[in-house]
Amino acid sequence: MIDFRPFYQHIATTHLSAWLETLPLQLKQWEKQTHGDYAKWAKIVDFLPHLDADHIDLKSAVKSESVSPLSAGEQQRLVYHLKQLMPWRKGPYHLHGIHIDCEWRSDFKWDRVLPHLAPLKDRTILDVGCGSGYHMWRMVGEGAKIVVGIDPTELFLCQFEAVRKLLNNDRRANLIPLGIEQMQPLAAFDTVFSMGVLYHRKSPLDHLSQLKNQLVRGGELVLETLVVDGDINTVLVPADRYAKMKNVYFIPSVPALINWLEKVGFKNVRCVDVAPTSLAEQRKTDWLENESLIDFLDPCDHTKTIEGYQAPTRAVILANK
């Protein structure tokens, strides 16, 4: 099973130390309620070999390599174990000669977001809904002091720990399997990311307030979410599914989203990027057995979802507490 004690020790002397009042008990309770496959996935992480990487690149990719490459047989065994953790949603990863070609080219999103951010060097960062942690490693590559991701999905935790193991067990990033609604308000993070989460929330303004409660005064929110065309009063509430997803509740226009952020008290709210999701960014690969974007769009008109809504378009909004 995954040991969180190194994380507790890591934050004990930082301004995240107040979290230790609640977090260890929460994670003990979490361990008692884990999914039936969690033990199997955690065991796969244990099975992965301890490989010493001579070169790690987190600045331009998530990549590890050694002077002495793995043999064909060693690579085959490593691929076998990593594929037991499918589906791999967010990536890509290049680990000891193995290319984990994930469904999402999350590096595309990072390239859109990064130029607009306050420098991440020496910052304490929270990544809400972090998935398997691809962007967390890129934050480490930008010099962040501490990166904490939260995501309750157990498979993502095990994927993250597998990648960590193949990055020389780097402890600068940590994934905690909780949702933001389970976090006490710490007001301790210099930057808070919420990317691809807001439209899954039944109460989006509550989510925005929860994000604000984790920021230091003046800290930066990085919000990336689905949007639709329209004015300040435009919000799409899908009747049933959106792009075959059942758990999509509110998709605002950019002006409406800016209004929401100002409503809950954020300042200096600005939209820095709007981009449609392309078939190059989200697609089927050998590391994903499920459907992908092409299956979610109208086959005759890719500007619409299969339900007839505007096809996925994502905006990046920055704001300060």
UniProtKB/Swiss-Prot annotation:
The gene is cmoB. Belongs to the class I-like SAM-binding methyltransferase superfamily. CmoB family. Gene3D superfamilies: Vaccinia Virus protein VP39 (3.40.50.150). Its EC number is 2.5.1.-. It comes from Pasteurella multocida (strain Pm70). InterPro entries: CmoB, Mo5U34_MeTrfas-like, SAM-dependent_MTases_sf. GO terms for biological process: tRNA wobble uridine modification. This is tRNA U34 carboxymethyltransferase. Catalyzes carboxymethyl transfer from carboxy-S-adenosyl-L-methionine (Cx-SAM) to 5-hydroxyuridine (ho5U) to form 5-carboxymethoxyuridine (cmo5U) at position 34 in tRNAs. Keywords: Transferase, tRNA processing.
